[in-house]
């Protein structure tokens, strides 16, 4: 039990299994599924291998989902990974996770998606553009520009933050609508593509000679990195575990069901892409979703794909804004963040201050334009935290054998071991391929160490 000093109201359990599952599906499916396959085709130019790598990536993600499901059921509290790392390794490691997600990963992701959304909104609203400047501001010898696109991106961040400020039910209702809409649009593109599209099943025939074992493993590794990151977000319901009804059941099942739904959707849409285009025409194509739609339905179809992407990005933005503030809220409850962030809104029962501080920082990143570089540097940190969380399953089984576990990982210890091993390989590849960014990412995490001890001293002083 935490000191009363840090207790400022309680979050309420208002989310059911459907809500929690839609949060996960909405978070995972962003823009990646519309852009990643072209990059995979460049690494593995074979239709069967492309489908196989998506299935393998989905199965590895499912291993992670089953691993996190046990932790989420055993510790259904706000914060997700922050809670599990704190329990397994100590408060410093939990704090470093929360610090990195607050300082870079979550606000940076929100900023990146909000800016990415502008590229698609321009098609329907030409006045909103990152190239159309409203004002140039002189500050410390620099002259940053504020464009209409940045203003719209900031407005989008504040709009969804305001919705979630008004309570988890309001945020989850919007999430449900956006997630169902994005699933519907992806299914429509896929099914109609097979039914009435101008594609060919001959595109699935293998005409490419695979490289030797060493080169093939390198190509497979590059493709797997892209796939794994297209599945990022499969554990986000754990952040709102303290607001989910029957959490011992609904938290693990939301993770598992959400991952399985996305696996099915990803497999289907990739089959539609391959039905539309031969692999040679997909290699290196970033906007593979639009390219496939034009091949299936004609040039005008790209408009509908753009709409699907807009809906998809909006759903992913709302999902992060809904879930991520619970991490900082949990940190503040432990005295490791600003005390005001620990407060629950008396009427809306939301972590209101946590939502506000995330919105402000996200908008600063939108304005500064530095989020892209920061996110690139934190890939290694994200992988490291996931590996540590997977290992926490083993540690807590030994250290806390009496901890109630309403759900236990199926296939233990092989399933968690497969998850940890696969992520270790991906981490090694990331460090080898981008050592500078990897080291910078670890440096960002390391910056949290002195900040942790600063907060720890503040706790000691308050409780003295």
Segments and roles (model prediction):
Residues 1-38, 42-47, 61-66, 75-78, ...:
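Membrane-interface "cap" regions at the ends of multi-pass membrane proteins
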Residues 15, 19-34, 153-160, 193, ...:
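Hydrophobic, membrane-embedded alpha-helices of multi-pass small-molecule transporters
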Residues 39-42, 54, 62-157, 162-165, ...:
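Hydrophobic transmembrane alpha-helices that form the core helical bundles
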Residues 83-84, 90, 122-132, 208-211, ...:
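TM-loop-TM module centered on a large, flexible mid-protein loop between adjacent transmembrane helices
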Residues 118-128, 180-208, 228, 271-277, ...:
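Hydrophobic alpha-helical segments and their helix-loop junctions in multi-pass secondary transporters
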Residues 122, 186-189, 328, 378-405, ...:
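Hydrophobic alpha-helical segments of multi-pass membrane transport proteins
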Residues 148, 340-349, 386-437, 462:
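C-terminal membrane-solvent junction of multi-pass transporters and transport-like membrane proteins
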Residues 148-199, 232, 255-256, 378-388, ...:
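Membrane-interface loop-to-helix entry segments
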